[in-house]
Amino acid sequence: METETIKAGDSKDIVKSRYDACAEQGGGEGAVCCAGDTPASPSFAAEHGLYSREELSLVPKIAFTLSRGCGNPAGFADLQPGEVVVDFGCGAGIDVVLAAHKVGPAGKVVGVDMTPHMIERAKQSVAEAHVAETTEFLLADLEQVELPDGFADVVISNCVINLCPDKEAVYREAFRVLKPGGRLAISDIVYGGETDPQVRERFQANWAGCVGGAIEEDRYFQILQDVG
């Protein structure tokens, strides 16, 4: 019970502090949010084709350097010109940039993040990518996003919701801001089966790491069913 209390009370502050420092320092050595060649590191993304060469050519260096994603939600969301997209946990803006190119000048992309320096980096990214006019950013907790009901055609998120202690609340917000018939495109970390308790405890102790807040795949899908 004590461990759960620590997670609920402190995990947001831990994540915010870690990722804000990472963004402030530019993502260089000693400022890595997810350590090593994990599925959420830039080197992994390049070597394993999470993003195509064409996509990477559209992305400013700072956005990719600070990317800690585990997938490419803007790539599989089937984004169409003119659509409105919200990125939950946009970080330095790699997926905001890619989504903005897909929805074009008639569309709009809103990036949401709780870390001030990541928001600043994201603004830098969209300016360098020449998509600032169709993008905007909100500094907000994903459990309380200041956007109206039925705002977006698509909500995307990349390796972020696993870090949120109250995943149900985050998904309630995602479904709230979606239009009727809207779409979710989520890349995230889950446990695929039985996990050694000691291994899991080690991951949970480092909540800001890539696997810290992960839950079982079955439970993850149950949350989606319950709130959506």
Indicate residue ranges for each PLM-predicted region.
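Class I SAM-dependent methyltransferase SAM/SAH-binding core
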Residues: 65, 72, 80-145, 169
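Acidic carboxylate diad motif detector
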Residues: 186-188
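Short alpha-helix
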Residues: 212-228
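A short glycine-rich, Lys/Arg-flanked "PGG" loop and its adjoining helix->strand segment in the class I
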Residues: 168-183
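Short, glycine-/aromatic-enriched active-site segment of Class I SAM-dependent methyltransferases
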Residues: 190-211
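N-terminal auxiliary segments of SAM/dcSAM-dependent transferases
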Residues: 1-48
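A short His-aromatic
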Residues: 162-163, 210
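Hydrophobic beta-strand segment of the Class I
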Residues: 85, 154-156
